[in-house]
Amino acid sequence: YQVSPWVLVWENGNYYLIAYTEGRLKHYRVDKMQGVRQLPDTVREGAEEYAAFDVNTYMQQMFGMFNGPLKKVTLQCENRFAGAMIDRFGTGPILSPCGDGEHFTITVPIQVSPQFFGWVAGFGPGVAVAGPPEVRAEMKRTLDSLQDLYR
């Protein structure tokens, strides 16, 4: 790979390099890199993209540093998980009461991946993907395939 490095981040016990390549910013796990060197007479690329880049937002959208399509996902959560949602997504997203006094919804940008589905499943029946329909359907397919595995 040939990249223009911009920032190092620490996530899940590993450092990741966020760098510009192929017209966009991508991340690479540092401990898996080999033969790293600076190329002579190269110009750092991606300054405009990095200026518009928010590292914290990028990290909040991703689960386990796995990429996926970026979607605005709505989660329906039991009230007891409000703290967990704030811990994960910060205080920016609005927690909207559902009207039953027991649940709220939160809509957040997510890079949808199997790791995201695993994170949601970790809350058991207390957190559900409410939308969009294609993400909810993908969550259901994931859970169905896991259930089939353990029959």
PLM features per residue range, with description:
Residues V55-R151:
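Polybasic (Lys/Arg-rich)
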Residues Y1-G64, P69-T74:
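Core beta-strand-centered patch of the WYL/Sm-like small regulatory domain
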